[in-house]
From Swiss-Prot:
Species per Swiss-Prot/TrEMBL record: Xenopus tropicalis (Western clawed frog)
Stated name of the protein: Protein kish-A
First-listed, main subcellular location of the protein, grouped into a coarse class: Golgi
Annotated GO CC locations: Golgi membrane
TM region(s), chain numbering: 54-71
Record-stated family: Belongs to the KISH family.
Extracellular membrane side: 27-53
InterPro entries per UniProt: KISH_domain (IPR051523), Ksh1 (IPR009653)
Length: 72
């Protein structure tokens, strides 16, 4: 089933996108900083969410991991 139609899969994709963008921005800041607008600006925004809300994102990742491992 597609991640669009399954809510849990959609949340997983969004969490992975946020974590990946924050990690890439930490490694190569210029890669995401030059594209702050447009369709590629989504990745910059995800990186900012990952940096600023990192404790909440980490808790969401742990909760999602436990729900995948033990509730499915």
């Amino acid at each position: 089933m597609s991640a669009i139609f399954n809510f849990q899969s959609l949340l997983i994709v969004i969490l992975l996108l946020i974590c990946t963008c924050a990690y890439l921005r930490a490694l190569v800041p210029n890669l995401l900083d030059k594209n702050k607008t447009g369709i590629l600006g989504i990745f910059w925004k995800c990186a900012r969410i990952g940096e600023r809300k990192s404790p909440y994102v980490a808790v969401c990742c742990v909760v999602m991991a436990f729900s995948i491992l033990f509730m499915q």
